[in-house]
Structures are given as C-alpha cells and as structure tokens.
C-alpha cells in the first residue's frame, strides 16, 4: 500500500470514530482556529519586511464562510489579539473570545502557538505579557480556568535543528488539549500528532512528572486526560469551517434556551468534550488558499520602502527575496490585463460572478482563460467540501495550462525573431556573458544612452507579461503551499522514526535534460534505467521530451515549449510544465532528488528541493568550465564568471557526486569551496554486452588481419582533442607503415578530421551492441581528450580487452593502471611515443589480460550500492 493511501485510511478510521463519539443532537460544530484582517503582523519574516498582513479578509466575510460550511458556533483566533471578537460582540454577534498567542518555551528556546479561549480584555493584556514564558502563561490560564490548545504541535520548528524528545515530553505534561487536525497541515503531520498522543498513557505522564520534577496540576485541570481538537487555520476565508471540532453539550437543545452558544462552547472545551472533524489533507486546498492570498497582495500591495527593507532585521537572502517580490508586485500592478484577471479571479473565488458586459471587453485570445476563471464562482456552491476543493483546483490547472500554451507560443515567436535578427548569433559568447553583468551604478539604469544591450528587452517582453505573471502566481501558490506543509520534513521523518509509525519510504526522482541523445550522459542513464528495473529500485528517471518513449521507472513529460538558442544550436531546450512536475513529485511520494544535468532540469531540481524540503543531489557528468574554455572560447574574466555561476549552482545542492578524483579535488579546493563531506566520488560501469569478441578486422574495417589498428570512439569535436589524432597517426605511420586508424562517431569536427586523415576509416555512430566487436578487433584505443569526467569509452574498451592510451587527466587517470592495461601520458608527443612503443612490443596479450581484469573492478552492483548509500537511500533500496 502506498504511503499516502495508508495515511488516508488511518485518518478515515480516526474520523469515523470521532464522528460517532457523541449524540448528534447534542453537538455544536465550530472551527476552533481561523483568522481575519486583525491577524495583521505575519509570523514569517519576509511578510514583515514587505509589510503585508496575513490576510485582508473582513470578519463579516469570514463568518459567512463559516456559516456556509455548517458551523453553528463562532470564534476568531487572530494572532495575539481578540480585536475582531470584541468588535463583533459589540455588534451583538455571539462569538467566543479567542486568540492564537505566540509563546516562548525558554528552556528549549522554541516558539509555539497556543490557542486560547474565553478570556476578558484585561486578561488579554496579561496574557500578552506572559506569553514570553509559556510556563507562566499556562499557570495563569489554569488559575483563571481559560482553556488552551497547543496549535499544530509539529509545525514551526527550524529544519536545521530537531527539538529534543524532552521538549515533547514536557509539553505533553503541561498541555491538556492538542490540535490534531489542522487544515493547513498535511495528513502525515496531523496523523503523527494523533499517534504521538495515543502512545502516551497515564503511566507515561506520571513518569514525565517525576523526570521534570513538575506537578502537572499547576498547568492542567486533569493532567491525565488529553483531548484532541481540529481547526481550519484559515487565513483567506476559503475553506474556513471545513476542518474543526464537534463539541458535546449534554441536553444541548434545552441548554441553548438559557445559555449562549459561546458559553456552551467554552464549557465543552473545559470539559474536554471535543471530537475533531476534517478530511485528507494534501497541498491542493492550501494552494488555492495561497493563490487567493497572492491575489489579495496584488490588489492591496504598497511599496514598503527600500531603506526600511535594508534596515529591517533578517539576513541578505530574506531581503533579496523581499526585494524581488516587491518589484514583481509593483510590475503586476502596472499591467492592466493582469490586474483585471487577478481582480476577476479573486472575486470569483469569493463567489462573486462578473457582469456579462465586462466579459465582452476582453481580447479574444484571453477569453478562454477568463471564462474558466468565471466558472469558479459557481464551484464555490458545491455540495461537498471535496467537490469544492476539486472543482477549484481543476479550474486552476486548466487556467495554468492555457497560460502556458499562450506563453510558449509567444515565446517561440520571440526566439524565432531573435534567430532571424541574429543579434545574438553574430556576437561572441564572451560579450554575451559580459552583458549579463548588472552594473553597480544607479545612474546606468536611469541613463538609457548607456544601455548597450543588443536586444530590445521591452520589445522582447511585450505580449509576455500577462501569461508570465499569471503563470508565476499559480506556480508561486503551489510552491508556497508545499513549502508550508513540508518545510519540517526532516523533523517529521525523525519524529516518525521515534514513534515507529507512519515512516515515509525512501524514493528517488532522477532528473535529466538528456535521455534520448547520443552522448555519455544519456548512455549512462540508459544503463542506470536498466539496473533500476532489474533490481526493482525505488527510483524513477524523469526527462522532458517529445521523442523519448515512457517506460517502467521512466517518466517523460511533454514540453510546453521546445527551443534552441543561437549560442548553442545543437542542443534543444525543453521546458516542462512546472505545475505538472510539482504535482508529479507529490503523487510519486519521492523524498529525494538526483539531478544529472545543469540545464532546465537542474533548475527543476532546485525548485523541488526547496518546495518539498527534500535532499537534492547533483550528479556531475560534465566539466563545464573546460567546455566553456575549449568549445565555446570563453576566456579571462568571463570564464571566472562561469566558474562563479557553477559554484553557486553546485553549492545549492546537498551533495555533489563526481566521477574522478580531479573533480573532487577541484570542487573542494579554493576555486569552488564545497565542503569535503558534500562531495562523493562514484563511477560508471559498462553494459554486459562489452566482452571480448573474436577479432574480425577484414569484415569490420576492410583490412588484412595483421594490420595494426588505432581506434578512436566518441564525439568528434574539438574539445575532445580529436584534431590531435592526425599528427599522432602521421608519426606512427612513419614507423609502422601498415598501421590504420579507425574513427567511430560523429560531430562538428568530422569534416575537418576527414580532410586531415584522408586514409582514415570513418564509421558513423553505431549502436552499443556493435561496439564490442570493433573494440575487440582493434590493437589500441587512443583517447586525446582532456575533457572527459569519466569516459565510458575507456571502460568499454578495457572490458573488451583493448588497452588504452590516454592523458593523465580526470576519469581515465582513475581507471587506467599505467603500464599494465594502457598508458597515461602528459603530452601529444608522449602519446605518439607510447603508441609506437606498444605496437613495437610483445605486450599485447599481457595488456589485454590486465585490461579485462581491471574492468571487473567496475561492478554495477557495488557502484549502485555505494551510490545509494551516499545519497542516504541505501538501506531501503537494497
């Protein structure tokens, strides 16, 4: 059974028991945790920097939502104040006074939230003074018979530091009531709270009392009776009342004739007559709520001021994010179509349908998007909570897909125009990278005459603003909902391990931009895919392509856009639907990532890492710094910029997996500054088809059996050093007149190499099943590349008993045992000399035997086992 399915089944059993605990005629339905506009100081630092409240929702609208969702008793729990309750009470509304106080646990230096009910204005003043020490706070509430609830007990901790077990033991001792169902938390977190409380009995409470030297009656009326509550924790109004509590009041009907509902609620809370209600929680509901909030910010946002932002407490990353968000909202507010959509979308979410006249004023290409938004107004009238949530979310997905299509089509036209204009193509890559740098001087942004960009940015962005901003808002809502629910994932994992219940299985999503291409990364991933299927590993490989065919453990997303750049036209850039990827990660129940490419999927990996708070590992296949220098001609300061960008990228991952000792030394050295414990060396293995085959030079190469054959296999490009083959071959031929060279592969330098070696035997790219015969029929493999991080060709060659002569660099240096199964050289002249020396010697059989022996050291089972252990998934995968 899948993890989420198991959680849902356990939750359904729990809800069924709670629903039938009390006689239905004697219960009041209430949402014990909801907010309105008076929750005006956000807990999150970025919200305080931007000076935005947690919501602009009015009390009246909140009450409408609560009543619509069947609540027959009312309360509002704003942060550290009950202003809304007092205002409503003055208007004659029967509302239970309440607040959610942010309290400090001084001995553990941890902040928690405490829902507090039935206090007076004077008591509120005292509670705000005491909340700096939760023990004094709870002593006060005990003395004055003010019921409290520890809100979302497993939320609000630093992901870097797990609160100790003693903290939870002590909180169990001093609290009577615990919020078990919170509408803003996922089912995993809620069920862990329930399981934790279930595992504590009277004997445990007595044990904690003795351990801490605390008399729990100082804090609790009945220390041995632990009650469970529920609340929506709604800030936007949407879904308020869908999670909450049934409160049991014996003889309710007659009691209501003389006692207000708020007093009866207070009585039931004090007596612990509470049964939580709700539903399976995942990110959909919270995504809708955050999208509602983003719309509210866009409609109400005001510039918080740059100086204020710079002087505000918080680290630089918080201020950079705040600065970017502030500029985003400011730009959105200047765009009429986007603001019209946001206003329409928000009003429809709140149940207000626009007039027919307004719909007629829309451009035709926007009408389908706006029409889908209008449907949301009707969805809110759904018959069940699930219908409402599913209806809202499906409309959001439809709108997102429409926006993506519109954005991709327009972006494709823009890029096509850039190709035709060729303003980028005619410039060197050096100058393009230099133009990406942002000047420090403010004057340079004001004085347009200093802007020497070759591209008219405003013209390029024209027509992209609405689909881009709207898509970003939808993606931001998904990101924020996942971040809110899962930012304590490391803690929840360890907490579940302590409870020995609801432990999430380890499951890897492996991301790559390349799978169907003819390159080393693709070849390795094909091998990995086969091993995943053979071994039944909990790993799925994901790529984005129109050509790759899906398979078991191979997920293929169709791109919403497919582009090539004027800079590097050989490689397609496929853009996935980020929301589709976001939901796929959740549905697949993955808990960690491996990424094999630095392109779009590299960015996707970092997005998922931060959205779901999972470990992300980067598998470094390519030396991009050398590629930038050798293949792209980048030099000097711009090469340094590339290095810094790579450093920033690699340091963003939890671990980097490298394929040779040189890479590890470089990454942990002064140039890159990665921590040594974050860099792990791994390796490739060769396909089982690579074994020694009978030599057949005649049919394969069209030469005599005794003709010495030099072999090169791989991409034919300058960065691979292939142009060195011509002078090497020429010099060897002077000594060994009958020697021939066979070159297998294709690439941009093929034509030049054919001109340089007119008598060379050139074979196009062949399927790997045909390569063993070619390797077995050659005499020595020449590898003039200084670029390869591992070089599968070396391992394939050795597996077929073919010695290799390569540069003493990177991957080959770690694989080849010098003077046993080949030679490691330092120059073109030394490679030439060793080739002549080997062909002149009688070492053929000795070297061939050593080659096959060395290849056996690279065993797939061992390599995969060590790889999984290095990414923290070894125990469950094997």
Label each PLM-derived region with a short phrase.
Residues 3-21, 27-53, 121-246:
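Domain-core and long-helix interface of multi-subunit machines
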Residues 510, 702-720, 726-730:
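Conserved donor-binding/catalytic core segment of Leloir-type glycosyltransferases
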Residues 750-769:
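Nucleotide-activated donor-binding/catalytic signature segment of Leloir-type glycosyltransferases, i.e.
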Residues 766, 773-778:
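Short alpha-helical donor nucleotide-sugar binding micro-motif in glycosyltransferases
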Residues 786:
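Aromatic "clamp/platform" in nucleotide-sugar-dependent glycosyltransferases that forms part
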